[in-house]
């Protein structure tokens, strides 16, 4: 059976762990030559080894994203390792600060926006021209379910993901006519790949009452990324796929029960 990303090349940022790692592994399993990138060299090489051991092709590039120079350097080194072209770009790198609005200082604000938004913007700027010259490509951004639901924590992080989802639509309009499909994935509450199944995940509380009722697995996000990167998604542009167990778009069971409960006065 033909693999869906056979003979394609891909760069996945923030792919030394968690969702990014599973996306890189998923791409490798579907035939893509993958560049794994991140700050932890040991973990990055372990992801490369995992892909190669399964018969795939992968290389690692160290990248500490946040500035324009780092984005451009990563794009250049990745393209060199991939034979001069990057068919698929996944903007996954991101950081989540443990601060509230009242406790966030300027350095933290700038760092989070630099990694979560600025790096994606300038990496896309660096990669898109070669994609256009090659006849097209696919760019996949990682948003988040909390970009569209107000929570008392994570205001800074959620605002960056809202920006990324807005960029997705803008880039689809800008680059779609030039052959580049731009879409995003909005993950819900996702278990870390190495989480002890006998220990309750703190984020599970946010899934109570949602249709899925429990956190998802990173493999669900990887499957969505493979789909968006493949020719199967040729008619999908400017979309944000909610892979969140129904958390954002469906009333919780408690809310639904309140809505459907008969009026006592009737």
Q: How would you name each of these model-derived features?
A:
Residues 121, 215-243, 248:
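C-terminal substrate-recognition "lid" of short-chain dehydrogenase/reductases
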Residues 124, 160, 168:
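Active-site helix of classical SDR
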Residues 100-101, 105-113, 195, 206:
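Substrate-binding pocket helix/loop in short-chain dehydrogenase/reductase
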Residues 129, 173-177, 234:
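Alpha-helical segment proximal to the catalytic Tyr-Lys
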Residues 149, 237-266:
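Short C-terminal tail/terminal secondary-structure segment
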Residues 9, 16-18, 40:
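Conserved glycine-rich cofactor-binding loop
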């Amino acid at each position: 059976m033909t693999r869906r990303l056979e003979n394609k090349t891909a760069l996945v940022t923030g792919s030394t762990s968690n969702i990014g790692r599973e996306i890189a592994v998923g791409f490798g399993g579907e035939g893509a030559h993958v560049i794994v990138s991140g700050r932890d060299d040991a973990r990055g090489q372990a992801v490369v080894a995992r892909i190669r051991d399964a018969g795939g092709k992968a290389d690692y590039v160290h990248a500490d994203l946040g500035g324009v120079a780092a984005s451009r350097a990563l794009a250049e080194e990745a393209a060199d390792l991939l034979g001069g072209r990057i068919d698929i770009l996944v903007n996954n790198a991101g950081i989540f600060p443990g601060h509230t609005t009242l406790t966030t200082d300027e350095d933290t604000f700038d760092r989070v926006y630099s990694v979560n938004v600025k790096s994606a913007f300038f990496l896309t700027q660096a990669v898109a021209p070669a994609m256009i010259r090659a006849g097209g490509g696919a760019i996949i951004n990682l948003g988040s379910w909390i970009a569209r639901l107000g929570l008392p924590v994570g205001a800074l992080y959620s605002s960056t993901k809202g920006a990324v989802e807005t960029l997705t639509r803008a880039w689809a309009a800008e680059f779609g006519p030039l052959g580049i499909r731009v879409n995003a994935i909005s993950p819900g509450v996702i278990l870390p790949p190495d989480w002890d199944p006998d220990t309750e995940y703190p984020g599970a509380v946010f899934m109570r009452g949602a249709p899925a009722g429990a956190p998802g697995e990173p493999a669900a996000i990887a499957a969505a990324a493979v789909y968006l990167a493949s020719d199967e998604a040729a008619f999908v542009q400017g979309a944000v796929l909610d892979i969140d167990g129904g958390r954002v778009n469906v009333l919780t069971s408690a809310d639904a029960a309140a809505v459907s409960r008969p009026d006592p006065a009737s």
